Curated annotation (Swiss-Prot):
Residues reported to bind Zn(2+): H79, H238, D242
Cofactor: Zn(2+)
Family: Belongs to the LpxC family.
Domain of life: Bacteria
UniProt cross-references to InterPro entries, sorted A to Z: Ribosomal_Su5_D2-typ_SF (IPR020568), UDP-acyl_GlcNac_deAcase (IPR004463), UDP-acyl_GlcNac_deAcase_C (IPR011334), UDP-acyl_N-AcGlcN_deAcase_N (IPR015870)
Signal peptide segment: none
GO cellular component: membrane
Molecular function GO terms recorded: metal ion binding; UDP-3-O-acyl-N-acetylglucosamine deacetylase activity
Function: Catalyzes the hydrolysis of UDP-3-O-myristoyl-N-acetylglucosamine to form UDP-3-O-myristoylglucosamine and acetate, the committed step in lipid A biosynthesis.
PANTHER family: UDP-3-O-ACYL-N-ACETYLGLUCOSAMINE DEACETYLASE 1, MITOCHONDRIAL-RELATED
Keywords for this protein: Hydrolase, Lipid A biosynthesis, Lipid biosynthesis, Lipid metabolism, Metal-binding, Zinc
Protein name: UDP-3-O-acyl-N-acetylglucosamine deacetylase
Organism placement in taxonomy: Bacteria, Pseudomonadati, Pseudomonadota, Gammaproteobacteria, Vibrionales
Amino acid sequence: MIRQRTLKSIVQMTGVGLHSGRKVTLTLRPAAANTGVIYRRTDLNPPVDFPADPESVRDTMLCTALVNDDGVRISTVEHLNAALAGVGIDNVVIEVDAPEIPIMDGSASPFVYLLQSAGIEELNTAKKFIRIKKPVRIEDGDKWAEIRPYNGFRLDFTIDFNHPAIESDDQKLVFEFSSQSFIKDISRARTFGFMRDIEYLQSQNLCLGGSFDCAIVLDDYRILNEDGLRFENEFVTHKVLDAVGDLYMCGHSILGELSAYKSGHALNNQLLRAVLADQEAWEWTTIEDEKDSPVAFMQPGMVLA
């Protein structure tokens, strides 16, 4: 059977918070079967836990943020969450000593490296998948996102940016999930933003950690980063990365196909909530024979670059 996974050892990394611009320390700890993904603020006394749950996502303005009833929050969880989904980690406690996960280079790649450094431990409990049984669609103006039954996990994503630096041919991506393809083709795509927006946010004491080191930055005509893009379709690829992270906020791998047009964190979260609220739209399932699995996770001990 495909088994649940956690980490073999405790790992830690330090980075800068996108919003505060301050140093943030992130610690990942192994967890027992059926613990799920738990985010924990350790700078508070007592510490505050946020289980991965679409209902905990209450702010999607500039990132995906978990907020509890007392207004305590952890921001910018989506790239780490995408890395957990990509590597197939079911059980982990994520400790952070700040109100946000460090932004690192603006992609999921540093988190994938961290998870691989910790090592993967398979647990003697079946991995629980959410299998989509019928289509569910959310619309917002001309934006939409839909998930439908599919024997695997596939994302068909289209963006629509009218910008000289973003070619029309590079605004659509179909991604068939496997750990190997996620790490190789998706995880390195960075977040992006416009210089005018960053300057405005920083004037409002926001996005203080934003820089060329953690994002693709554009003006009205071109990409301002000296090194340019990591690959031609990096913009839409990052949107796929975000969607992988946003959908994994249910704490389980999904068997289904997401199609989306101009979707972002808010629409992704609304879709996930709508699916889980409809008892006829999904079911729990396990995969007894790994040879029959429609999704391929990396083997424990294997390092993919």
